[in-house]
């Protein structure tokens, strides 16, 4: 994206001595690159958290800490398996798109990454299976035990950062997302008690809804950690701006997932099988 010259920036030429500007000056290319960057870096933070919980389970001398880590990891596992693999597909598709037609041939290596990412949503349980595991077994059957653990983490972090002026723009939407997550889960549970099909109808949207909030938490923590570190200003800015993009452009996806969940199972089950 920094090397390929194509068209001129809408605001005027950036490289007047060249026949065109690099495609990274175009907003839509930035959208694709930032989406891939935000999902990938956030996913790494979540995956490392999962690994740290495994260490606690295997190594801690504190029985209560081991149990807490096990309950939390049990809840997060389908999110890690389901969301991270789907986001890998999205990120690799955006990267391939930035290459244009050249990305579709073997020379760039991008097509291999796209194919490798795609299979991850199938093996080790498809996305639909991970979603059912999250909503059915790990949330409703446990009365939301793992969810409560994670919500407690969010509340504690938001409370800790309330007076930090660098975190204001992230804390308010994160705290609201936590409240909405709890209320939506209760509503699904109520509906499932009346119609078990609601679990299957809501599960995939609930998986992504949960995943985006989990990643919002890790992006907020990443910004707080970066700002408190001795890293160069350029590093801190990159974290802050990527987090801002995530909160303003990707976290709002939860709203469409919530709307789909609340529309109910009827629109999925009404059509006769013969019509497909």
Predicted regions: what they are:
Residues 16-25, 62-69, 187-199:
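Short, charged/polar, low-complexity loop and linker segments
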Residues 31, 35-38, 79-82, 176, ...:
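DHp/HisKA dimerization-phosphoacceptor four-helix bundle of two-component histidine kinases
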Residues 1-19, 39-61, 84-102, 138-165, ...:
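Long, well-ordered alpha-helical segments
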Residues 41-44, 83, 126, 130, ...:
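Residue-level signal for the membrane-embedded core of alpha-helical transmembrane segments
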Residues 141, 157-276:
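C-terminal amphipathic alpha-helical interaction region
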Residues 18-20, 28-34, 64-80, 112-121, ...:
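Short beta-alpha connecting loops at secondary-structure transitions
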Residues 49, 71-149, 245-270, 274:
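Alpha-helix capping/hinge segments and adjacent helical runs
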């Amino acid at each position: 994206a920094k090397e390929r010259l194509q068209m001129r920036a809408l605001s005027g030429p950036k490289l007047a001595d060249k026949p065109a500007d690099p495609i990274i000056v175009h907003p839509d290319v930035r959208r694709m690159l930032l989406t891939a960057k935000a999902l990938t870096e956030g996913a790494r933070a979540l995956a490392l958290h999962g690994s740290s919980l495994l260490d606690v389970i295997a190594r801690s001398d504190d029985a209560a800490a081991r149990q807490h880590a096990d309950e939390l990891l049990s809840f997060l596992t389908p999110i890690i398996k389901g969301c991270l693999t789907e986001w890998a597909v999205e990120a690799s598709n955006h990267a391939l798109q930035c290459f244009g037609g050249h990305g579709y041939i073997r020379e760039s290596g991008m097509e291999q990454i796209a194919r490798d990412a795609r299979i991850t949503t199938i093996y080790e349980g498809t996305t639909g299976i991970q979603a059912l595991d999250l909503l059915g077994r790990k949330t409703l059957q446990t009365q939301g035990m793992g969810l409560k653990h994670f919500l407690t983490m969010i509340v504690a972090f938001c409370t800790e950062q309330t007076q930090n002026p660098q975190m204001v723009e992230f804390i308010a939407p994160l705290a609201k997302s936590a409240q909405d997550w709890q209320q939506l889960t209760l509503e699904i549970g109520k509906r499932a008690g009346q119609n078990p099909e609601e679990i299957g109808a809501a599960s995939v949207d609930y998986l992504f809804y949960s995943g985006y909030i989990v990643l919002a938490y890790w992006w907020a923590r990443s910004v707080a950690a970066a700002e408190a570190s001795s890293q160069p200003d350029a590093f801190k800015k990159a974290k802050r701006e990527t987090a801002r993009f995530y909160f303003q452009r990707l976290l709002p996806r939860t709203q469409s997932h919530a709307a789909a969940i609340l529309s109910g199972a009827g629109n999925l089950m009404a059509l006769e099988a013969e019509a497909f």
